[in-house]
Amino acid sequence: MKLPVIFSLLAWSLTMSAADYDLNKPFGFCTVTSRSDATCTYHVTGGGCYTYPLPDGFAGKVAVLTSEGPDADMEKSIENAIKHNDVVILDGSKGDFMVAGRVDITVGNKTLLGINGARLCTRWHMTADMRRVLDDAGVPQMDTHGGGGMLPNGARVREEAEYHTRRIFIEKTGDATESFRNAGVLSLRRCSNIIVRNISFVGPGSVDVGGSDLLTCTGSTNCWIDHCSFQDGMDGNFDINNQSDFITVSWCTFRYTERSYMHQNTNLVGYSDREKTGFLNTTFAFNWWGEGCVQRMPMVRVGKIHMLNNYYTSTSASNCINPRKNSEFLIDGNYFDKGVKKYYSQVDAIAVTWTANNYIAEASSLPGSMGEAVAVPYDYSVAPCSEVPEVVRAKAGATLFGK
């Protein structure tokens, strides 16, 4: 019989509320510029504020957008608003914001806030008919590591499952350009000092076509992604790569629904073993990996990663925390609920520190620390892991600034 493994549930004797743990301000790696020197601080301001209503006397440029309707592509409208304003507020009171492709943020010092239940959604999405055709072709049983070929449009694909999925979609849609692969929402591209808060990202459903993530951070630094919800990303929900650095992901939720098909791989940090070392330093704090998540919660190459008070409930998980080549992990105060059986594995990591303050409901063996003790260059407080389920369930996701 598997018995719960409880590690020092009372790290703090002081009982705190969810509001006490939610600092409502930037913290973690986004507030520094060094992976080891605490004196190298950074003041994350985004476009000058990050709360709503905006502070009295705020002098920055502000744009407030509402939905233009369920058939309108708002990709360029949102992109232009971000380019020409310091703060962009997405007001969900008139419905969802639909985008045909990723909104690119390529300039720094920007804040993007959602209010009134703002949702950024992809126009293209998987359907029951698409899933049925893929099932009939036997795609779930196909190789995901080799056995690909050349598509009718001349593109070469390495993996068998991806090759047949894309071939079927080209034939079914008649779209040789494969525009469906661009069904992502937001891309932070080589920019810095970015704040994104209180937005729900809704994707097309995960499917193995080498497509877009809901949110991608590429070569960007000092970004704070807070209180957002991510659902049904095509390739991933939120990936961080290409020498991005000093990122904090806090109070976010990640999940998949019946819209998703394969490749429920939610958070990748480092696109390959070839990532240049010294980058990708990231804090994941008070996040919730829930229904439908299978892998990459997160999977990381290269970076120093702080896993602080995160909550895991996905019973379909085949691997949750996954340190990979040249990564370092500090794992503190996390809670793996009943039904989460595959919670951790590492391959070629430099160092992993599991503190005493973690809870694993169905552990048959304890994960061991390895290498030198991992430390982070900023102050933080750890909630007792026993409080994580209640606190994270109450506060994580797009729960700020009105419904």
Residue ranges and their predicted role:
Residues 4-13, 17-87, 96, 130-168, ...:
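Extracellular "leader-to-stem" segments immediately downstream of a signal peptide or signal-anchor
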Residues 75-82, 98-107, 122-126, 323-324, ...:
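Short, T/G/N/S-enriched strand-turn elements that build extracellular solenoid repeat scaffolds
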Residues 84-89, 119, 194, 245-246, ...:
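Loop/turn elements at helix/coil->beta-strand transitions in domains of secreted/extracellular proteins
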Residues 96-278:
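Right-handed parallel beta-helix
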Residues 112-114, 194-196, 223-226, 247-252, ...:
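All-beta strand scaffolds that present successive hydrophobic residues in beta-strands
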Residues 203, 232, 256, 261, ...:
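Residues in short coils/turns that link rungs of repeat/solenoid architectures in beta-rich domains
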Residues 227-230, 236-241, 252, 284-291, ...:
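Conserved catalytic-core segments centered on acid/base and nucleophilic motifs
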Residues 299-403:
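Extracellular beta-rich repeat passengers
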